[in-house]
A protein has these predicted regions:
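Interaction/scaffold regions that mediate signaling and macromolecular assembly across diverse proteins
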Residues: 18-86, 90-266
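Positively charged n-region of N-terminal signal peptides that target proteins for export
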Residues: 1-4
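Hydrophobic h-region of N-terminal signal peptides that target proteins for export
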Residues: 8-17
Length: 266
């Protein structure tokens, strides 16, 4: 009896893992249709008005995410778990916006102290009530869990200042390449990351808010400055400025964050 009980549990786990769509096909189809690339592919906007017409499909996808229990999730590979969490963050954020669209200009219209959209338990995940902050800060950024600062370039907070929403779903098989492309896109986006005429490195507030994420030895890099040095050629076209960044000598300042909704307004 013990053998058959063990067999049943094992079989159930395998069947469950096989049952979940790790290609995230529904979300993939939605973003391919409603995410518009701008600025030579370095940014994106969302056609919320059109996405709203397919809200039933979005809700169906969210229900498939919510159906996954923590024990199933823990049995997946690291890339599968990361792709799941990133897609969940982005899809639940889009759904949050649609609950008020078109009468919304910023995600902060929900409120900061009361109704904070990032702290609101408006969905369930892994068998319990969840928030957007819980996905990002308590799960993806949890020390020792993934130690992957590029998640900041993948999760999208529905704001112009945020790294772009990717025009496809994140999938385990290509996650490394997808995250790296997101990093390159964001660091190449001059309105959000650049070197000024005075040789000052002006970068997104993300690098201020989450400074410690680039100080944990990621890819052998021990600081934010060393990370910028690796991508010096993306931050400026000027060889002298590139040299300054590559040597870690450029002073750093942080740009104001634009919380305007990343909407394609007609």
């Amino acid at each position: 009896m013990k053998f058959w009980g063990l067999f049943f549990l094992l079989f159930s786990g395998i069947a469950s893992a096989q049952g979940f769509d790790h290609a995230h096909k529904t979300w993939d189809a939605l973003v391919k249709k409603h995410v518009i690339l701008i600025d030579a592919g370095k940014g994106s906007q969302i056609r919320y008005a059109e996405l709203a017409k397919e809200r039933a499909a979005l809700k169906g996808y969210l229900e498939s995410l919510a159906a996954i229990k923590e024990e199933e999730f823990n049995a997946w590979s690291r890339p599968q778990r990361m792709a799941f969490l990133i897609n969940a963050y982005n899809a639940f954020t889009a759904e949050k916006i649609l609950t008020r669209y078109p009468n919304i200009k910023s995600i902060w219209d929900f409120g900061k102290l009361f109704g904070n959209p990032f702290k609101d338990e408006f969905f369930s995940l892994l068998g319990r009530k969840f928030t957007l902050d819980r996905i990002e800060h308590e799960t993806l950024r949890k020390p020792g869990a993934y130690d992957e600062p590029r998640v900041h370039f993948a999760v999208n907070c529905a704001a112009i200042g945020c790294p772009m929403l990717r025009e496809e779903a994140y999938v385990a098989e290509r996650l490394e390449a997808q995250l790296e492309q997101q990093a390159v896109r964001f660091l190449s986006d001059r309105p959000r990351n650049r070197v000024s005429g005075q040789g000052r490195l002006e970068v997104s507030k993300i690098f201020d808010w989450f400074k410690e994420d680039w100080s944990s030895g990621y890819q052998g890099i021990q600081s934010r400055e060393k990370y910028f040095a690796k991508y010096a050629k993306l931050l400026s076209d000027d060889p002298e400025q590139q040299k300054l960044v590559a040597e870690g000598k450029a002073p750093i300042s942080f740009l104001d964050y634009d919380w305007t909704l990343n909407d394609v307004r007609k």
